[in-house]
C-alpha cells in the first residue's frame, strides 16, 4: 500500500474533492454508532473490515477493502459514542491505500438525534490524483448511489443493534438495598 499524507478533522472542510450526503434513520444514535465499527456489514462495496489492535477509539486502526476502489488503512480521528444529548461521531483518515484515485482522504459520520430517529451526515473529503480528478463526476454519482443503498441497510442493522442499557440489577458484590 502507498502511504497517504495524514489528515485531520479540520482539514476535511478544505479538500478539493468533497462529497456530502444526509439522511434520516429510524434508529438510535447508539445503534448507528455500533454499526459504524464494521462497514462491511452495511456498505455494499466493502468486502472486508479488519481492526488492528483494539476496536474503536481515537488512534485505533482498521483496514477495509472496497471493491473497485482498493484497500484503505484508516486511523480513527474521532470516536464519540452517543452521550446524554444523543449525538455521536466517527471520523477517520486514510493513512495508506492501494487506490490510484486519492493522495489524501478522510471521512466523517455525524449522528444527530432527530424526530423518530437520527440524522446521519456523511462527509467524504479527498485530495484526488490526476486519475481521481478525471473520474470525479463518476465518483460523485457512485457515492450518491452507494449512500442510497447503504442508508437503509445501516438503518435496519442499527435498529436491531444490541445497545447496552442500564441494569436494574445490583452489581455483583454490591449488596441490594
Regions found by a protein language model. Name each.
Residues 2, 98, 119, 125-177:
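A conserved amphipathic terminal alpha-helix motif
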Residues 32-39, 62, 76, 92, ...:
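Hydrophobic pocket/interface hotspot
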Residues 44-45, 53, 67-119, 125, ...:
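Hydrophobic-ligand binding "helix-grip"
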